[in-house]
Amino acid sequence: MKRTYQPSKRKRTNSVGFRARMATKSGRNLLNRRRRHGRHSLIDL
């Protein structure tokens, strides 16, 4: 049986990358939330 998680760097970056976050209002809110919190990394890839 094929496993459900088939990792691909491009797919992941396109869906959860910085530019994907910046493209939507809620994504920008998320980045600002992480900035306010003082996160070392804004995006977890």
From Swiss-Prot:
<dbReference type="Pfam" id="PF00468">
    <property type="entry name" value="Ribosomal_L34"/>
</dbReference>
<keyword id="KW-0689">Ribosomal protein</keyword>
<dbReference type="InterPro" id="IPR020939">
    <property type="entry name" value="Ribosomal_bL34_CS"/>
</dbReference>
<dbReference type="GO" id="GO:0006412">
    <property type="term" value="P:translation"/>
</dbReference>
<dbReference type="GO" id="GO:0005840">
    <property type="term" value="C:ribosome"/>
</dbReference>
<dbReference type="GO" id="GO:1990904">
    <property type="term" value="C:ribonucleoprotein complex"/>
</dbReference>
<comment type="similarity">
    <text>Belongs to the bacterial ribosomal protein bL34 family.</text>
</comment>
<protein>
    <recommendedName>
        <fullName>Large ribosomal subunit protein bL34</fullName>
    </recommendedName>
</protein>
<keyword id="KW-0687">Ribonucleoprotein</keyword>
<dbReference type="InterPro" id="IPR000271">
    <property type="entry name" value="Ribosomal_bL34"/>
</dbReference>
<dbReference type="GO" id="GO:0003735">
    <property type="term" value="F:structural constituent of ribosome"/>
</dbReference>
